[in-house]
Amino acid sequence: MEQKQRRFTKNIFVLDVTAKTLCGAIAKLSSQPYCQIKIGRVVAFKPVKNPEPKGYVLNVPGPGAYRIQDGQDIISLMLTPHGVEATTERWEEWKFEGVSVTPMATRVQYNGVMVDAEIKYCKGMGIVQPYMRNDFDRNEMPDLPGVMRSNYDIRELRQKIKNERESAPRLQVHSVAPREESRWMDDDEAKVDDEAKEIVPGTSGLEKLREARSNVFKEVEAVINWNLDERDEGDRDERGDEEQVKTLSDDDDQGEDASDDEHPKTHITKEYIEKVAKQIKLKDERFMSLSSAMPQASGGFDRMIVTKKLKWQNVPLYCFDESLKRYELQCVGACERVAFVSKDMSLIICRSAFRRL
């Protein structure tokens, strides 16, 4: 069952001071300034003393065909000396004078009380006389340059355009919100991470990632002499981080010292090498004039260049004494800060939970 369109009541207050229309004559006979025309399910009119809130005040000089235009609302009125016709529906067989509205903030008496209210004022000129036939035939297309008649009527054409728009493929927009783990990434790491996302998953993508990682290690080895022993690295993995520190700090154990002399242990981890390599590739101007060097278990430095807030796992941790300008290895673990120090003309990157002795 077709649903009926909901109708909203419209109130028009006709102000005809010359009393040349039926509305003006009724208002004059009742000694009232306005004649109210109410349009809803029915049409009614009566003389009133003042307009109501949200009402239209139509000021006319005499008879005429008036069309009030208020956004999507259109009210058509025929005012003659002997009758009144009004509608909010389409009424295209007659010509009308278009009248625009002006909202105004006023105070009016409503239900016996003075209230602040908005009214919409509109003024007609009476240039279109009532019931002038509209000569334009809506079904007849005028002869317009560069325009041809379509094979569809207007409803079919609108439906056709709608169907084409709905059937057209739509571009899917993916979210580009950063992931939570990227919060602790350096600029170079975030860039590498973005490049990895762009690679299509598959065999070729994995090969590109492996090749990129291999190139990083080659560049690092060309700059820094790591002096790592593969056999020592295997022993370090088996013994664990705690035994490394114990081996480095236990100077009294002669058996261990003899073993260390033959195969020196290292506190440098694979993760440390990867992170340092990325820092070197940044080519920071503060470090351009310095050559890279590895930190010892303990040593001195000339000056502290900068500290950065980073978060990495399984790296050597140092304590710094800025007054004596020395650093000392504590253990291997997680860090949140890293110190960049210089010794002579060398750059030493000590990743640590930065603490001052």
UniProtKB/Swiss-Prot annotation:
Superkingdom field: Viruses
Keyword RNA-binding applies: yes
Region (Disordered): 169-191, 229-266
Compositional bias annotation for Basic and acidic residues: 233-249
UniProt cross-references to InterPro entries, sorted A to Z: BTV_NS2 (IPR007602), NS2_N (IPR037194)
Ranges annotated as biased composition (Acidic residues): 250-260
Annotated GO MF terms: RNA binding
Record keywords, A-Z: RNA-binding
Family: Belongs to the orbivirus non-structural protein NS2 family.
Function statement: Single-stranded RNA-binding protein.
Protein name per the record: Non-structural protein NS2
Lineage of producing organism: Viruses, Riboviria, Orthornavirae, Duplornaviricota, Resentoviricetes
The encoding gene: Segment-8
